[in-house]
UniProtKB/Swiss-Prot annotation:
The family this protein is said to belong to: Belongs to the methyltransferase superfamily. PrmA family.
Location in or out of the cell: Cytoplasm
Enzyme nomenclature, EC number: 2.1.1.-
First-listed, main subcellular location of the protein, grouped into a coarse class: cytoplasm
A GO BP entry: methylation
Binding site for S-adenosyl-L-methionine: 151, 172, 194, 233
Protein name: Ribosomal protein L11 methyltransferase
Organism: Dechloromonas aromatica (strain RCB)
GO molecular function (one): protein-lysine N-methyltransferase activity
HAMAP family recorded: Methyltr_PrmA
């Protein structure tokens, strides 16, 4: 027997309170979607750090998962009354078949071939090429599973630029994928830093899973020193703000690679970094670019 997936429309002021009330009334899960998604009225909620985002969608859709035998109208009435609604909203119901959700989720993530010798492999998969450099990485809380163009741009750049025993810093490490790749490609000392403590914990766990030694730290315990190679795959606003700090970690003659940059942002980022490191376009994938340069 499956579950009942119930959805209804509401406004931004009632969406979150209704979700809370539904969960309190016994719903298994409750989420909010943009009812205008895929139309010209779609409202983006997440942008660059520092940008002003709206607190919710003006036209919201609440989606609730209920037990198979749940009384939908009674539950909606109870939740609505709890937040002061006098009427039950019009709703639709979709039956959701019972499935092995872990197996279903895992089936959506296949090994990713980055290059001739570099693969990203979820832990539940067999490695397609045991002789390759296989990065064992599961989708999780931290950004960086290898599927995004910027991650692949940085991995390809590292493969071309990491030399035996060089030192590497992954600035904004997320899952730690770039630092782990550098270590597996032959780097000596490898470090990573991220503002998010959860990302640091994920990076440490991923490094252990891959059998590599890397120092990961959050912003409370910043990484010190200069490195032969520094790579930063973060958004363009942090790249602007953190330019002096990032460049300070590159030793004279060392290499820097930046990604998380769109085509239209190339000139601005190059201009900002020019006083420390001359950058040029190293590679492009879709609308994303990787900029790289050598510190004088």
């Amino acid at each position: 027997m499956g579950w009942q997936n119930v959805s209804f429309l509401t406004d931004v002021s009632h969406a979150e309170p209704m979700c809370d009330a539904l969960l309190e009334a016994g719903a298994l899960s409750a989420s909010i979607e943009d009812a205008d998604a895929g139309t010209p009225d779609e409202q983006p909620q997440f942008g660059e750090p520092g940008s002003v985002n709206t607190p919710g969608w003006m036209h919201s859709r609440v989606v609730v998962l209920l037990e198979p035998d749940a009384d939908i109208e009674a539950l909606l009435a109870e939740a609505g009354a709890a937040i002061g609604l006098s009427e039950i909203p019009a709703y639709s119901v979709e039956n959701v078949a019972e499935q092995n959700w872990v197996q279903l989720t895992q089936s959506q993530f296949d090994p990713i071939r980055v290059s001739e010798r570099l693969w990203i492999v979820p832990s539940w998969h067999e490695t397609p090429d045991p002789a390759a450099v296989n990065l064992i990485l599961d989708p999780g809380m931290a950004f960086g599973t290898g599927s995004h163009p910027t991650t692949r741009l940085c991995l390809e750049w590292l493969e071309r630029n990491v030399s035996e025993a060089c030192t590497v810093l992954d600035y904004g490490c997320g899952s730690g994928i770039l630092a782990i790749a550098a270590a597996r490609l032959g780097a000596g000392h490898v470090a990573g830093v991220d503002i998010d403590p959860q990302a640091v914990e994920a990076a440490r766990a991923n490094a252990e899973r891959n059998g590599v030694t890397a120092l990961f730290a959050d912003s409370a315990t910043p990484v010190a020193g200069e490195y032969d190679v520094v790579v930063a795959n973060i958004l363009s606003n942090p790249l602007r703000v953190l330019a002096p700090a990032i460049c300070a970690h590159v030793r004279p003659g060392g290499k820097l690679a930046l990604s998380g940059i769109l085509r239209e942002q190339i000139d601005e980022i190059i201009a900002i970094y020019a006083q420390w490191i001359p950058l040029q376009v190293a590679d492009v994938r879709e609308d994303w670019v990787c900029l790289a340069g050598i510190k004088p």
